[in-house]
Structure formats: structure tokens, C-alpha cells
Amino acid sequence: MLDQIKIHNIKQIMLCLMARRCATKAEIVEDTGLSTSTVSSCVNSLLKLKLLVVNGMDDSSGGRRSTIYRVNSAYGCFIGLDLRPEGIQGVVTDCEAQILKRISFPLGGGTAPLHAIMELLNAEIAHNKNVLGIGVGAAGKLDYEEQIIVSAPEFGWQFVHLKEIIERQYMVFTHLDHQINAGAIYEGMMGCARGEKHYLYISEAPGGK
């Protein structure tokens, strides 16, 4: 069992590699601020778990060439859903956050939002056998700690335990967040705000309050 410190270190290394696409151990040390021995130990563990793969050697002009590592994109996939009044939009990504497929389910004609969500997930989980996680972005009032949609007037929802519903049905880890938070987190972790301690994320999308 991994302790919490090692889990944190591995998370930092994985985020570094997802943002850079590939890196040597020295580059990971520089980006994360972790010690050389910590990075080496974590990278070796990730290689054994097949979460990382070797991506060749660097073009060093002298001395020993360094090994380049990257996330094993084929390890599994993730499903992300964006819940909006006009329909459910989503993507399937690999472990490097590269989009493999865009998915959608229009709402209207009496289609229940929860039915649309489950129909999308039924199809994608049947097609992708190694789904590692599901992320859901929703508008409205959310209880982040309990992972509950407290109120979503566009859907007529009150106190919907969406995370629990999805996890019970598919036995796949699911995380619920507000659409705006999800966008801001992505930019901070992998987008244009990566490395910034403070930044402002603005969205003009409907429901972005």
C-alpha cells in the first residue's frame, strides 16, 4: 500500500508528464521540486505498474544520455461529461488526456437528463473495457464534499447523488465538480495557467456564475 506522501509525489510526477508529454528524470526534478532520489523511486514504481513507458533517449551532446519517460496512453481511458440544459456533451480520453472520441446526447422531447447520462455511459463503457474514471461537470449548486447536486433548476434536480448513482451502476471512480471549477483546474494543471500560483479563469458559457 502506498503511503500518502508517495501518492502525492506520484501525482506531481504524473501531472508533470501529462503537461510536458515526455521528460527525463532531471526535467521532472526541475518541474516538481522533488529530490532526485524521490523521482527515481517513483518513476521506477510507475514503470513496474506500467503507468509509464520509456520514450527513447535524449540528445545529450556529451556524457551519459538520459532516458525519456512518458505516460502510457494505452493503460486505460477516462470519460468526461459536461451537463448542459441543451444536452450532454462529453469526451473519451486516453491517459495522456488526448481526446479519443467526442460524445453527445441532446436533451429535449421529454428526455430525462439522468437517462441521457446513463445511455452515454452504457455505450462508452461497453466499448471501452478499461475505463479508469469518470468526471462530471455540472451547473447549479453543488455539495463538493458529499458529491451531491443540491440544486440544478434546468434539470429539475434537487439533492441528486449523481456520483453514487454512477459508481453503483458501473463500479468506476467518479468525480463531480462545477463546470467552471473543472475548466479552471484544467488550465492550472495542464493549460495556459500551469505553474502559476494565482490566476483568474473567466467563462462566458451559459450557467457560468
Language-model-detected regions and their locations in the chain:
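Short glycine/proline-centered loop/turn elements that form peptide/ligand docking sites
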Residues: 3-7, 21-23, 38-41, 45, ...
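Extreme N-terminal segment that seeds HTH/winged-HTH DNA-binding domains in transcriptional regulators
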Residues: 1-25, 29-30
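Gly/Thr-rich phosphate-binding beta-strand-loop-beta motif of the actin/hexokinase/Hsp70
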Residues: 63-100, 200-209
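Conserved phosphate-binding catalytic cores of ATP/NTP-utilizing and phosphoryl-transfer enzymes
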Residues: 54-76, 178-199
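Short beta-strand(s) of the beta-wing in winged-helix/HTH DNA-binding folds
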Residues: 24, 53-54, 59, 143
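Basic amphipathic alpha-helical segments that dock to polyanions
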Residues: 17, 28, 39-52
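Glycine-rich phosphate-binding loop and adjoining helix at the ATP-binding site
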Residues: 99, 103-122, 129-198
